[in-house]
Amino acid sequence: MKKILLSFMAIFISLSVYSQETTSDVKGFVSDSSGNSVGGASVSVVYVPTNAEAKASSNSDGYFVVSNLKSGGPYSIVVASAQGTKRYNDVFLSVGAALSLNVVLEATDEVVATASLITRNVAPGPSTVFNLADIEAAPAWDRDIKDVITQDPRIFVDESQSYRGFNCNGSNPRYNALSVDGIGLNDGFGLNSNGYPTSRMPFSYDAIEQVSVEFAPYDVMYGGFAACVVNAVTRSGSDTTSGKFFYEFVDDSLQADSLEGDSLTINPYEETKYGFTLGGKVPEVENLYYFVAFEQYDDFDPYERGYVGSGQANESSWLSEADFNRIRQIAKDVYGFDPGGLSKGSPSEDVKLLAKFDYFISDQHRAEVVLNYNDGFEITPADSWTPVFESHFYERGHELQNFQ
């Protein structure tokens, strides 16, 4: 029995920490027209997409807090007592922050307020929050949240490197911390330079609803970083079933073969991205919602180096085809090793799947189950030397599974 109780305590403690990192709060002070605090005022916070309601009431000093709310919106907030009623429409909450309200009740009919003019989100330290509108409007050509968060001048993405690492206030990407719905996705062994534990972003771009970047959060729940903390929150289903599909394609046939009359040497390459999202309400189950996001990336990058006469974009003047074949034959005859032929290019693949279920149990409790899966590989050179043999390249794969 004690073991069972301890298990439940551990679960609730972890859920408490999780909710603080990835959800939002609404807090405030209720007063009448004379400035006196109003105790016992009812507070109703309704998440409009699902009509899920969270309730609270102000204490004897007029203060109230509604915790563990899903970030985003829109929300409708109603504060009511014998002194009057006030409604806030189109309220949007920021991940990891608390919305602060100063509610003044008047003895008149219901007052409807514009939330954006009288509310503010309070975060624990310097931070930036990007909502769904920011994510959808960003020119994310690589389908990566780096293309969103780089709008903050304190973040720099190194476009000169293929891995596109992002630096917070000039620090190495390995000093950052990344979480998705409270799941830590850090590069624990420091094998990558892009700030991720995988070769590409380990979750679907279309699955993200909000991203926050916190540079110096003064909160004990944060740790394991020295630069910044990136918190991403995934989308959820609603009462309306909706989805989307995308397909992107580019290859060498879409590139010009000459420039100002001079012919260009173009090696074959191809890149394809496609995926879908689907979200809605689970049929015949009250207050249960689902969201699924899938994304796949296939790529073939040409290797542009070769011997003289190979037709590659960059031919080594010191290496002829005869020398290339002689080196290969010596390796086979003397050392019993075949270094392979001329490398033509390197394929890569990346598959992402995210499934999420939200269950609104009551006006005080909400359950969330998230599965995130990422699998892929890339062909990469063994070191920075620029040879042309196939044996110099190897397959570097990764597989990531998270469930909570």
Model-derived features with residue positions:
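Periplasmic N-terminal accessory/gating domains of Gram-negative outer-membrane beta-barrel systems
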Residues: 59, 83-85, 89-100, 112-236, ...
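Positively charged n-region of N-terminal signal peptides that target proteins for export
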Residues: 1-4
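Outer-membrane beta-barrel translocator domains and adjoining extracellular loop/strand segments
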Residues: 255-261, 303-309, 348, 380-388
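Outer-membrane beta-barrel pore domains and translocons
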Residues: 116, 214-216, 246-250, 293-297, ...
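Periplasm-facing N-terminal accessory domains of Gram-negative outer-membrane beta-barrel systems
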Residues: 19-112, 121
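Transmembrane beta-barrel wall of Gram-negative outer-membrane proteins
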Residues: 242, 267-377, 398-404
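Extracellular loop and loop/strand-boundary signature of outer-membrane beta-barrel proteins
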Residues: 196-197, 260-264, 339-343, 388-395, ...
